[in-house]
């Protein structure tokens, strides 16, 4: 069994997820996890797929030749060693928006705390 991370980006339209899932299932793949969104008329997503080793090459070929109108990148992943002594934090920051706010926050997290950002969601609320 092989695992792949697949990223997609393109103009949003009906049928994109259906098209991706059809390619995956036709190659005996299992859609494990995903995060997909539509922003400003664009569709972006990342998903994890498991596929039998014997079908891996055909899956990547089919994804690369798909006529879905998406930019698709497919990369094989290896098992990740999760350290049990790593601490997780959930940070919620509410404040006035200004240029560089994410840069300042990420600098503190990376350089001062050696923290890894695993998920980031931002929005401006009027």
Where are these regions (language model features)?
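A conserved regulatory-domain signal marking ACT and ACT-like small-molecule sensing domains
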Residues: 1-126
